[in-house]
């Protein structure tokens, strides 16, 4: 899935669209990526002399990736809402030039609520992991 297809599914836009492409996708799992550039707006303040991608934005990228997994087959007018986070851990810095990989898997589904396990890696090293909750709402 390329960026044009992603933008047809997700409501997010620059500078807050944090997924550049999808590498793998099936009913229960997704693998997507973000090419982290020095031109990202958040690097202006986080931190100018030592740029690091904020952990909360890594988790937001996971949530957006979850939205792609959950909305890939719908033609309804719905949006994914990030409703919760558990067990978040940040293990390695994400820096300009990194290719950040998001791997997400559905753990539970109840009505329009989903719990997913997310792992973010750079060069196969875990940068962050979390369990996230996403709700699907008609817009």
From Swiss-Prot:
CDD domains per the UniProt record, alphabetical: FabZ
GO biological process: fatty acid biosynthetic process; lipid A biosynthetic process
Active-site residues (renumbered): 46
Keyword NAD: no
Name of protein: 3-hydroxyacyl-[acyl-carrier-protein] dehydratase FabZ
MF-aspect GO terms: (3R)-hydroxyacyl-[acyl-carrier-protein] dehydratase activity
Phylogenetic lineage: Bacteria, Thermotogati, Thermotogota, Thermotogae, Petrotogales
Annotated PANTHER family: 3-HYDROXYACYL-[ACYL-CARRIER-PROTEIN] DEHYDRATASE
Role noted for this protein: Involved in unsaturated fatty acids biosynthesis. Catalyzes the dehydration of short chain beta-hydroxyacyl-ACPs and long chain saturated and unsaturated beta-hydroxyacyl-ACPs.
